[in-house]
Each structure stands twice: as structure tokens, then as C-alpha cells.
Amino acid sequence: MGRKVRVGIDTGGTFTDIVAVDESSGEVVSTKTPSTPSDPSEGFMTGVAKVLDHMGIASGDLTTVSHGTTVATNALLQGDYAGLGFITTEGFRHVLEIARQSVPEGYGNSYFWVKPERIVPLHLVREVSERLDAEGRVVRPFDEAAAVRVARWFRDRGINAVGVCFINSYVNPDHERRMRDVLRAEHVECAVSISSDVLREYREYERSVTTLVDAFVKPKVSDYIAGIKSKLDDFAATNGDGGVPFYVMKSNGGVMSAAEIGEQPITTILSGPAAGVLGAARVAQVGDFDPVLTLDAGGTSTDVSVVRKSEPTMTTEGAVGRWPVKVPMVDVVTVGTGGGSIAWVATDGGLKVGPRSAGAD
């Protein structure tokens, strides 16, 4: 009878860390391999093969693979949002530009602070005529002809990820769903996220940005997870049961099957960092340390959190870099600075480090 081995893998922007546990003997083996940013699944599978080789076992002995990833985190932090568009209610085109009045701590009313670029520039924001009141009643009907024109406008410009946030859609999602249907019909290659699916709450700015983050990471996370799942199934084909169970860590510390991740990619935005905090919480519990400040410094980003009474701190008011991400998550402060971050000189002459990283390449 073969051994039963569980494998956990954390993929960062620079390194991939792997740990394997023999369920019978309790043997634990860990190793590390460079990540492969051009195709992260290659580094993932290299790590699986490497740790199993260290244990001297076959792929058929795998019972479960759990994965924490910073693919979404690093994509968001490095700030290249080309190919992302935004659709909103007519008259609300500037919702991202207005944003909030807050400025980074330490700047106050300093004249030299420059407002950062928006996640979607104004020229890639389109409006559709429609309007719901605060109770979800239709004030202005959804203009399907205008929606078709907008969908084709994005298609013709190669914008393949679009977030949709209509006013008061958290009460009544009908108009957003119709916009999604139009996009799917007119622009079949487009990844679409609608705010009524992603964040069904009031506050247009936060809802818009959270939806855009979901749309931005959706193709990256979906392709990444699908690629890993396919290769993992091939690798573990000797199981004879169609593959090994594959789970992905969520930002709130839970796990989700690979099949579900494609529809809710934003839940993985702090996947890797959340796993690190859970590990630190376990160490704090065993060592009877309280409270504990955790710091997880990788090659691309650095994550800091607090553990109290052996429990991670949770929040629904989180942020990744400068973007609010209002989904349940472990309360982690993430900055785009790590061991491989690239230094550069800003327009004001100041020396900056990150968020771009040399990565593993």
C-alpha cells in the first residue's frame, strides 16, 4: 500500500516554497525552487516533483495539494493595468477620478503630493444610459443599443477585461447582468466582472475599484489555476481517480476548490500572505506568544499582520497597495517592496524602491 502525502505550495513572484507531509509517519520535508513568472505553473510542478523526489515517493501517493499564491497580489502591486476598462452609469464617468479625499499619511496638505494614476484612466471609462433609485426601482431603462456600442468599442481597442458598476446595482442587479450578457455576446474574449456579484454593498468608489480588481486578476488567476490543475492531473494520473484534489487558499484563511476560483478570483488576492499569517498564528499558539507581529518578506512584496490570542486579525476594509479591496480577508498590510525590488528615481528626484521587481527571471 502506498504512502499518503499532502503537499502545500506557496508561489511568490521570485520563489516557490514547497512542504510535504506524510500522513502516516508525520515526516515533513520542505524545499524551494525559483518561480517562473512567464508560466508560474512550471515552477509549481517543478516544486511538486522536487519535494516528492526528496521523500522518495511516487506521484500516485499524493492525496491533496493546497496552494497559496501571490500571482494576483503581485500583478496588482506592480501596477500594469493595460487592457482594463470600466463601464458605469451615464453621468458618473468620473467616479474613479473623484475617489476619496484622503492622502497618504505624512503628506497632509503638502503641495508636492501627486495623486496616483487611476486603476482605469478616464479615456477607458464608458457610460451607459440607465438608472435605478435607492430602492432598486428603474428610473431610466437600460439602453441596450448603447450597451452594444460600448461593448464593441472595447472589443475594437483590444480591452479584454472590463468591470461594470452601475449606481444602486447592489439593490437590483438586473441592469448589470444585462450589460454582462451584452459583453459576452459582442466581445467573447472579454473577462467581465459586475459589482453586484463581487461586492453587493453601497459606496460607489470602493465597489467600483473592488470590481475592477476582480476583472483585472480574473484572466490571470483563471489561466494560472487551470494550467496547474491540468498539469497536476497529468502528473498524478497514476492515482487512477482522475487526478488529485487541488485547493487554493483564500484571503480569509479558508480554501476553495480550483473549479470555483475562476468565478471568484478576487478571493485569492491575499492568498499567499493569508497562509503565512495562519502559519505564524500556529507558531504563536505553540510558543504561547501574544500578541505577535508577523512579517513575510518575499522577493516582490512584503506583508505585515498582527496575531492576537493565536488568531489572525480579520477585516472587510482591506487594501492591496493603494487600492481598496472590500472582501473578507486576513488583515494584512501589503507593500510592493521585496528582496528583488528595483530602485528608480522619481520625477521629483527622490529615490524609490519598487513596486517593480526583478522577479525570478
Protein language model regions, located:
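N-terminally biased helix-coil "hinge/interface" segments that flank
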Residues: 1-361
